[in-house]
């Protein structure tokens, strides 16, 4: 994957997240600034998703901790093979919201 494809794939993830939050009518603010997507919950807690261009990775930080994801076999996964979406659903739950991607 080249850098342009990387940015396109991450932006698709961010778009999916925004659309799902809107579809579910969740009270979560979504802000995207440069390489960082911030999801802010009612209690002011946050999930941060950011691009790590140098490594072509997607990083997720939440109350669960921090995780790194590489794009392999058409999906974002950790080194252990766990999907980004599974981690994100758990992070939402830890922040008090139920969502399914």
UniProtKB/Swiss-Prot annotation:
What Gene3D superfamilies would the database entry show? Answer: Frataxin/CyaY
Q: Name one GO biological process term.
A: iron-sulfur cluster assembly
Instruction: List the keywords (alphabetical).
Output: Iron, Metal-binding
Coiled-coil regions listed: none
Give a single Pfam family match. Frataxin_Cyay
Entry-linked InterPro entries: CyaY (IPR047584), Frataxin/CyaY (IPR002908), Frataxin/CyaY_sf (IPR036524), Frataxin_CS (IPR020895)
Cellular component per GO? Answer: cytoplasm
Per its UniProt entry, which superkingdom is the organism in?
Bacteria
Query: Which GO terms label this protein's molecular function in UniProt?
Result: ferric iron binding
- Role played: Involved in iron-sulfur (Fe-S) cluster assembly. May act as a regulator of Fe-S biogenesis.
The similarity annotation says: Belongs to the frataxin family.
The protein's name:
Iron-sulfur cluster assembly protein CyaY
Give the species this sequence originates from.
Actinobacillus pleuropneumoniae serotype 7 (strain AP76)
Gene label: cyaY
